[in-house]
Amino acid sequence: MTIDHTQRQLLKQQHPEYFTLSDNTVVGIPMQAMGNLSLLNIPTKLQVQCSRHLYQNEIDAIKEDCLQRGKAGAVIVSPFISPGEQQIATAAMHVNIPLIVLRINGLPPDFEPETRYFEACANGILLILTPFPYQSERIENMRQRCLQLNDIAARICKG
């Protein structure tokens, strides 16, 4: 679904708590956040980590497991960077399974979720977290950051 500017503004007015940047400490790490912070309190959290080298049938199996567990009440946690992770995020949002997304390049002061996440944020099924300051230029240590975010996702899931 495409949301035009007027609809975006209306959704932000209806749910200001989900569209306000805040500073928080999550698993002992200072982070910026936008979205539904209460998702951190859901007891069952599932980390998703898909190598770029997985075959589509392997991604599909992980996706099915995530969707089943999500429908049973789990929150899915991941940076959602790899194509497989992105497929899982998209499938989860289509059936209103909550996501905690760890962003690799921080959040600018005027941050607004991209189209694919906007409606999920308005519906309270999305939390975006980042331990990094905003960076618009190319990230030099991408692999290290990805590993850090996967480690943070694991820590969030262990609670």
Features from the language model and the residues they span:
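Glycine-biased, small-residue-rich flexible motifs in mid-sequence functional cores and linkers
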Residues: 1-159
